[in-house]
Amino acid sequence: MDYDYEKLGLKVGLEIHQQLNTKRKLFCNCPTKIRDDEPHGEIERVLRPSQSEMGHVDKAALLESKKEKKFIYQYYNDTTCLVELDDEPPHDVAPEAVDTALEVSTLMNMKMADEIQVMRKMVIDGSNTSGFQRTMFVSQEGFIETDYGNIGVTSICLEEDACKKIEDGKDYTKYCVDRLGIPLLEITTEPDITSPKMGKEAARRIGTILRATGKVKRGLGTIRQDVNISIKGGARIEVKGVQNLDLIEKIIENEVTRQISLNEIKEELLKRNAEVIDEIKDITELLKDTESKVLKSALKNKGVIKAILLNGFSGMIGREVQPGRRLGTEFSDRGKVLGGVGGLFHTDELPKYGITEEEVIKLKEFMSCGENDAVILVADKKNKVERALNAVIERAKESMIGIPEETRKALDDGNTSYLRPLPGAARMYPETDVPTITITEEKLEMVRNNLPEMPEEKLVRFVNEYELNEDLAKQMVMSYHVDLFESLAKKYSKIKPTLIATTLEATLKEIKREGLETEVLTEEHLDEVFKGLSEDKMSKEAVPDVIKGFIENPAKNLDEVLEIKGMSSMSVEEVESIIEDIINQNISTVNEKGMGAMGLLMGRCMAQLRGNADGKLINTTLQKKLKEKVQ
């Protein structure tokens, strides 16, 4: 949609969460290793809300407790410890993580805290075994430069990452504690972003600065973006868990569409004098003989069917608020999250799903549903049905007031779904088990004297020093292999840097697309490949096959891989001899086509010599020998 975002008063702020690539976790000596093998054990917990010192209970925490969920935590004996399981106090903060936080703060022009105090931030979804996350305020009031102008950075915090979610059931959530405690930077911007494109550019720039340090983890799940979005007459919506940079634009666009649509629905409902009836009616007896599979299944499991009446809502529940999502979807999200039900039916979409027209007529009569009214029904266990319908009643009332402030989950299609209300602001408490950290001027001076080269500077240098074209230089600057590239290019000056860069950026990706596990490759393997190339043990055409050989035989050395693959570097004399044989074997074609036989002969030469001789040598030798025959 082409909106006038300035007229709409769009304001967007980002929260970037980036894992740091440290040797140990933030509060213990466990490695920062994510595992997918079978865990060694599990524990179960139930978290309950408690009053603050002021006598208040956080509304998000209270809401979470109403779900009556238990939390299951998987652990490993050799890479996790009692700190993650909240059975041992936290150790001192990892110094490496603090140094990286100060470095990033300097690169973003932040004002540093004199002293870093570890705080406890309430976490209500079970993703931390203790019920809170340890976090440290490091710096404030900085900015980043973008093509759209400067964007303020409110704060940078150093905190522990949450558990990794494994499974989400109706009455339980299963986590693994291997990710819990990995150092994480939380970078929060001011709401200075005024368009979707600007939002994407801001996130890209922050990511660029983080990667420039060389001290952050790479790959899916290592960086997560939360996006706060609002427009005039709307509400602040926090969208959690945007993992793909390219999705940020669409998330912002679709949330603007959603808020505009919900405001239009509100105006229409007010015109109609719409009313939400609080009464929940039992319609189990009315639909006991239904052929609807969903309703029959609920009744078979000793469930009930109940319904509510929404006066003036006819046609509104089925109205689209985001691409493919309707007001009814908003109601359904609330019912699913707060009631634990699978979904709901509403009369805007009936008859359907096995519910007949006759049953709809009976339902409307029973509920006293007029022409402009709508009915919502839910089938499940009695307590779940009532929780779900009460949640829908609340959401329906909100639709006549405006847009509720919510935390929503980012979906893969650029839409969002309900997670929970926005949490209260005062969720931070001092951590009494970890001493404070004093930030001295000497420490800051050391950080300032060791800042990394920024990507834009590195790009110019790569083009000038290594003669990479601009596109390849851009890829290399942003690559996980950037340090390895520089090391190999300096170590093996005989090899063109372009070949090293394309191998690291293109060849490895092509091999991965073929289904081979490039993860088993080490820097030592790649060093052996280019060492062999520089010593003329192999040709550059052999590089992909040699890399595949290392993937298939990671314990072998280069000579062993070359032997397995049947590759060795031939002398010029050997190449000339083989090419002469190929020409003689195809002499009738040579006599008929002359130099026009070059293409056919080149193909046959490469089939026999690929991997054993340089392609350029093969080409020049063939041309020379063919001319001799033709003349």
UniProtKB/Swiss-Prot annotation:
Enzyme class: ligase
Annotated SMART domains: GatB_Yqey
GO CC term, one of those recorded: cytoplasm
Domain of life: Archaea
Keyword Ligase appears in the UniProt entry: yes
EC number annotated for this UniProt entry: 6.3.5.-
Catalytic reaction annotation: L-glutamyl-tRNA(Gln) + L-glutamine + ATP + H2O = L-glutaminyl-tRNA(Gln) + L-glutamate + ADP + phosphate + H(+)
PROSITE patterns per record: GATB (PS01234)
Record GO biological process: glutaminyl-tRNAGln biosynthesis via transamidation; translation
Alphabetized InterPro entries for the sequence: Asn/Gln-tRNA_amidoTrfase_suB/E (IPR017959), Asn/Gln-tRNA_Trfase_suB/E_cat (IPR006075), Asn/Gln_amidotransferase (IPR018027), Asn/Gln_tRNA_amidoTrase-B-like (IPR003789), GAD-like_sf (IPR004115), GAD_dom (IPR029351), GatB_C_1 (IPR042114), GatB_Yqey_C_2 (IPR023168)
Subunit structure: Heterodimer of GatD and GatE.
Entry function: Allows the formation of correctly charged Gln-tRNA(Gln) through the transamidation of misacylated Glu-tRNA(Gln) in organisms which lack glutaminyl-tRNA synthetase. The reaction takes place in the presence of glutamine and ATP through an activated gamma-phospho-Glu-tRNA(Gln). The GatDE system is specific for glutamate and does not act on aspartate.
Protein name: Glutamyl-tRNA(Gln) amidotransferase subunit E
Gene: gatE
